[in-house]
């Protein structure tokens, strides 16, 4: 049988594309009382053993889950977590993606036009906080969306 990932339409008229069963519960990704005593997810790809059943194709990058883990770890080291801590962590908008990638991108930029120089100046001064009113965050995201296809080339 041809493997169907679900990323393309299939012919629903014949019944050949129907589900043939479910992944057994014990094969689904799971954690029980991990050493860190916390389980964090931000819709990122669950880690699984090689050969684990396919449970999805499109997952966000792990940056958000990593940021949540970092904030939980540092906050819990300082004091017992409170509902206010969880609210602050939930509302956090710092972009680890930008923090990781932006210094490397800026190292290779030599803007010539005034508007480009202003954009680069905003990015260099940015605190990596992707607040809704952040011009630098908007510039970074637009830049990355234009840049990503050229970095990945035919792999996309």
Pin down the residues of each PLM region.
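Long, compositionally biased non-active-site segments enriched in small/hydrophobic residues and glycine
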Residues: 1-156
């Amino acid at each position: 049988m041809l493997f169907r990932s679900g990323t393309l339409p299939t012919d629903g008229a014949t019944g050949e594309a129907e589900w043939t069963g479910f992944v057994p519960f014990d094969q689904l990704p799971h954690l029980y009382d991990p050493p860190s005593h916390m389980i964090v997810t931000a819709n990122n790809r669950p880690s699984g053993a090689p050969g684990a059943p396919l449970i999805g194709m499109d997952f966000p990058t792990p940056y958000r889950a990593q940021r949540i883990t970092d904030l939980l770890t540092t906050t819990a080291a300082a004091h017992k977590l409170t509902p206010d801590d969880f609210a602050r962590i939930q509302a956090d908008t710092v972009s680890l993606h930008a923090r990781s990638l932006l210094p490397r991108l800026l190292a290779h930029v030599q803007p010539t036009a005034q508007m480009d120089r202003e954009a680069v100046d905003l990015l260099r001064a940015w605190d990596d906080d992707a607040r809704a009113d952040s011009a630098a965050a908007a510039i970074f995201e637009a830049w990355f969306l234009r840049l990503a296809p050229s970095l990945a080339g035919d792999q996309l």
